[in-house]
Amino acid sequence: MDEMATTQISKDELDELKEAFAKVDLNSNGFICDYELHELFKEANMPLPGYKVREIIQKLMVDGDRNKDGKISFNEFVYIFQEVKSSDIAKTFRKAINRKEGICALGGTSELSSEGTQHSYSEEEKYAFVNWINKALENDPDCRHVIPMNPNTDDLFKAVGDGIVLCKMINLSVPDTIDERAINKKKLTPFIIQENLNLALNSASAIGCHVVNIGAEDLRAGKPHLVLGLLWQIIKIGLFADIELSRNEALAALLRDGETLEELMKLSPEELLLRWANFHLENSGWQKINNFSADIKDSKAYFHLLNQIAPKGQKEGEPRIDINMSGFNETDDLKRAESMLQQADKLGCRQFVTPADVVSGNPKLNLAFVANLFNKYPALTKPENQDIDWTLLEGETREERTFRNWMNSLGVNPHVNHLYADLQDALVILQLYERIKVPVDWSKVNKPPYPKLGANMKKLENCNYAVELGKNPAKFSLVGIGGQDLNDGNPTLTLAVVWQLMRRYTLNVLEDLGEGQKANDDIIVNWVNRTLSEAGKSTSIQSFKDKTISSSLAVVDLIDAIQPGCINYDLVKSGNLTEDDKHNNAKYAVSMARRIGARVYALPEDLVEVKPKMVMTVFACLMGRGMKRV
């Protein structure tokens, strides 16, 4: 495309377009493809029939994709906004982007800013998140310097600037992610703040937050849309942690006639929440809802839900809480919503939404409101049904969780909730190939929504293509692995593919830093030992299976060699170590690695148990950080 199109745009407009582009480009590969457009319209929650959305996307791809490579580059995106500005299609596209979380109003045109959708969206999120964080951290002595924040000012954007609140919120969502001993709480110089923000961002990444576009400087500057985007991911991970069958067997009460436990386990947390709300609504004789936006605007479903889940005082030591339904017949929507929220308050669940958020059907905040209700009062009984195979509910292994978090942190779409079920159409695997510089021909890929008939065939074709790419050009070892195995969700064989993707991703980072020199296990081990001895450390490693790694001393020493003086050796145990000592060392080592800027996905247990694959990623990430020393 010629440069002409971008010349008449002001720098501010160009920055806004870049920001908008990043919001649509979910996997951050620099291009927008049609499934990302589908996702955009789905998230924007616009009152458009499905065929209309498909029509708009088709038109955008035809008009925007000028070099016909099946995707829209940034220049083509700019062209859409300039040349197609006045068309209805472009207006709808703009509206969808403005409704997606964020803060800039595209193009700065009066029609857009007068709608004010964007600004008011994030104001509401800010208000909701501030109240949630205030409550969560009200008794934490380390946060007294910023808590409570005023939800009506910009307190939040200043409060996250030193990294402490972010670290605390990450630990509330996934306990023990960050070793408290690694958080700098005193004498907060700019350098020390930078370390806290590294720790927060790399830990957020390790629990599955997509932080590719966020840097420590963005958080220090309190950039609102980035702060809110990151906080929402952290809060959501915490809210959704228990909406999962292996952690909450009573969810099996939501099984429908003829449905297997396996089918129920494939649902996302959002789908399970909707199923849960409808289970209680059916029991109350009220109609079902299809979403947490348009269908809850009148608060009537919420009244019935609260009435169903409120404790009836029948169990030992359970206080009875009566829900007053008189507000149900209030004629004014806002007053009805306020009356409903007063009842939610009796349950200690007046969180995330204001009456206006309910009436406007804000999907994100209403989802959070319902998730919080579920966590406090699920009101489900585990079925004593004989024909349920409870052995299926083993829950994911640590390794599976690490792989899943790694994928999600790279921004794959759809979000991976269940490692095997969510990879059965290979879309996520194909996106990961792009991340490891294996080109994917997206015109060969079948994308959802799949047809009712033959859906599995379409998914299998994708899986076959994924295996084909793995053999060549990726040169993976895939002996005995076929597309059918991915499509079946075969755990061992799917893991074999996923591990090779993660390994290649890790090595690519090193090769980029080492001017393209090939990296492998021996090179990493040699670098580790050389760096340790040059820093005068007595530790060394033979290989990634070396049993001495279980003390984490080699990792701790390597961190101190990369950034001299950063380790507080008073906190590190050596000599004859108990299991607790080993675990404490490993926890400190992983957090300190993240604090000095290494994006470590492995868990402390991986070091203690010397899991060679994960140990390799730890040393490779540290080598990457070590090579960045200027």
From Swiss-Prot:
Family matches, as SUPFAM superfamilies: Calponin-homology domain, CH-domain, EF-hand
SMART domains: CH (SM00033), EFh (SM00054)
Gene Ontology, cellular component aspect: cytoplasm; cytosol; neuromuscular junction; plasma membrane
Subcellular location: Cytoplasm
Sites of Phosphoserine modification: S268, S293, S326, S339
Chain spans, region Actin-binding 1: 109-382
Region called Actin-binding 2, residue ranges: 383-627
All copies of domain Calponin-homology (CH), residue ranges: 123-239, 267-378, 397-506, 518-627
One Pfam assignment: CH
Gene Ontology molecular function: actin filament binding; calcium ion binding; structural constituent of presynaptic actin cytoskeleton
Main location: cytoplasm
List of residues binding Ca(2+) 1: D25, N27, N29, E36
GO biological process terms, semicolon-separated: actin filament bundle assembly; bone development; regulation of synaptic vesicle cycle
Record's keyword terms, sorted: Actin-binding, Calcium, Cytoplasm, Metal-binding, Phosphoprotein, Repeat
Binding annotation for Ca(2+) 2: D65, N67, D69, K71, E76
Descriptive protein name: Plastin-3
Organism: Mus musculus
